[in-house]
Amino acid sequence: MDSPGGVTDKKRISSERRKEKSRDAARCRRSKESEVFYELAHQLPLPHTVSAHLDKASIMRLTISYLRMRKLLDAGELETEANMEKELNCFYLKALDGFVMVLSEDGDMIYMSENVNKCMGLTQFDLTGHSVFDFTHPCDHEELREMLTHRNGPVKKGKEQNTERSFFLRMKCTLTSRGRTVNIKSATWKVLHCTGHIRVYDTCNNQTHCGYKKPPMTCLVLICEPIPHPSNIEVPLDSKTFLSRHSLDMKFSYCDERITELMGYEPEELLGRSIYEYYHALDSDHLTKTHHDMFTKGQVTTGQYRMLAKQGGYVWVETQATVIYNTKNSQPQCIVCVNYVLSGIVQKDLIFSLGQTECMLKPVESPEMKMTKIFSKDDWDDTNSLFEKLKQEPDALTVLAPAAGDTIISLDFSSNESDEQQCDEVPLYNDVMLPSSSEKLQNINIAMSPLPASETTKPLRSNADPALNREVVSKLEPNTETLELSFTMPQVQEQPTSPSDASTSQSSPEPSSPNDYCFDVDNDMANEFKLELVEKLFAIDTEAKNPFSTQETDLDLEMLAPYIPMDDDFQLRSFDQLSPLESSSSGSQNAATITILQQTQTPSTAADEIKPVAERVDDVKALIVPSSPVHVINDTSSAPASPYSGNRSRTASPIRAGKGTLEQTEKSCPGAPSLITVTLNKRSTAMDEELNPKMLALHNAQRKRKMEHDGSLFQAVGIGSLFQQTGDRGGNASLAWKRVKACKTNGHNGVEQKTIILLSTDIASKLLGQSMDESGLPQLTSYDCEVNAPIQGNRNLLQGEELLRALDQVN
């Protein structure tokens, strides 16, 4: 009898035998299956190198695809191919820019052409038999399913069912920009333009042996073309292709110049304009949908569409558009388009848009703009040529024609012989106009002080229409009695050599001719008088021709007349009440004030006249005062001056800022040389309220600029330079400069000296004063009170009661 242990061993041995037999049977079945799959793989139309390395799943997948393709091919009637056609079959795929793909109604890739490897990096056998949804972008699946659907609904008579398909599909790509292949997990998305048809195939023998009918086979045949990135285009573009860049709203930001030869447009006229303005109206809906796909998928191909030419008609164009993303934030930045022109201009004489008309592309100039261009030209010809120019612009003549109710001012071209002779004697300077005769020029001593380059001005001189200049002069010559305020400054006159000369020298406070109205123009005054309008109207000649020639035409006087607009005009007030200064010396002689005229360029003739005078001068120093209106350094208690007298007055202008004037008043002994005297009066408070606010603003601007750019007050006072006049009684008609003297009184002659340091703005302020007889406390700022307090012998500022007493004495 067997023990229980022996029974257990028998069962275990039998179980192991069964398992071993089972493993052997499975091994046998697998080997037989492998043989079958191996034989099946060799039946597939594949190279041996490919079929020998296929697994069972791949063999089954490829076999199913092959059977479907056979069914698809058997559905149609195959025609016998000629030998020539068979030889050309190998060139079809090379001619394609993409690859061929056949999809079943379920989305399985029945067939993929072998050139898919060059486009996507994936091999033909890796894709065939797989579902297309495994290799496409998830956002494109819905659109792809819609394209695979074949609607069998009723179709209207006369219309066939639309079987064409065109869409954009993002598919995995394992190719890099350098041509290398990466793993499928590192693949990127590439946009494919898929175009084709959906087909329904019925086999010839659609009935099986059982008698039921086979369903038709539906498939989608596509040609997939990848859209190249603009940065990867290596083939040079031909003459029928042009590049363009657009903003996100499809406005041109760049266009290739080849568009001019192809469509007639200039690249500059397209910038900033939308591309939709140049689309044919029938293609606008299709292009709108294409642009929507472009922003969704990154790249599109528009297909053939019509783009309007410039002069009329259209051309057929196909565009590849690519969205360029910012590398930092991955946001869309711009759109680059490669445009292929497929045809010439079609229907050139047909206008499809208003933009094709020349009047819309070329802006029309108004008559006012035409007249401005005509009168702003420098190359003025005679009156006949001007008439021809105006005759060519009939619309512009209406601008010059007077309207109803306008006053027609007649132009007086007559001239006086005395004025012509006087104009011939006036030397014209490039910067400063000196309207005086030769007799007056002998009595004027000009202190040359060149201006910096930033303050140079152009002369108010023109070779333009003289009639307009005369019109301005006639408006600037009102009756002298009606003037309320005039800029007058007495001129320096040499001491008369005879009593007859002294009797004939009389002071005339009013300007006698339009020459006296000429003045030097400051940079700040240019805005006041609107000189830019004068320059455009008179076509200013920047360089005077023969400025010192005494043979000038009779029209130079009118050219020198300034132009003052009516809205910027201000009334002039005469400055004829000049308070004389009493002199204690009976032997002192009459002295006139010196007029310092500043100009930018030193004339050669004037330089020749000053040279002999300068040779007799030992030393000449200019004193520049930057700040405070008036500084008086009084070494004595009082300094009486000689009575005031002058030859005549001329109209003066506001003096340039940045130039200081120094004038000295001292008591002269009998027999001593005559001294130059400058008399100034304090500005009355009541007059300040009546002054033009524009002139006050100009006065303050000049004072501020002088305080910023000039030297300090202490340096100016330390120089102590002063001008002194010496009379040459031997017949010399000109004034000579003498050595600059110190401010302190010399002990050996006992002459009391008083130095007055004045600014050009203060002179202009005093000229605006109502009368020299009136006196009042000037308006002082806080800065003036700190600097200009009376200085006593101890050289300390007054404080407290002493300051109050000093102010009471002034009042």
Swiss-Prot record:
Post-translational modification: In normoxia, is hydroxylated on Pro-402 and Pro-562. The hydroxylated prolines promote interaction with VHL, initiating rapid ubiquitination and subsequent proteasomal degradation. Under hypoxia, proline hydroxylation is impaired and ubiquitination is attenuated, resulting in stabilization. In normoxia, is hydroxylated on Asn-788, thus abrogating interaction with CREBBP and EP300 and preventing transcriptional activation.
Biased composition (Basic and acidic residues): 8-27
Positions of region (NTAD): 529-573
Residues covered by the bHLH domain: 17-70
Residue spans of biased composition, Low complexity class: 496-514
Keyword line: Activator, Cytoplasm, DNA-binding, Hydroxylation, Nucleus, Repeat, Transcription, Transcription regulation, Ubl conjugation
Domain topic, free-text comment: Contains two independent C-terminal transactivation domains, NTAD and CTAD, which function synergistically. Their transcriptional activity is repressed by an intervening inhibitory domain (ID).
Record's protein name: Hypoxia-inducible factor 1-alpha
Organism: Gallus gallus (Chicken)
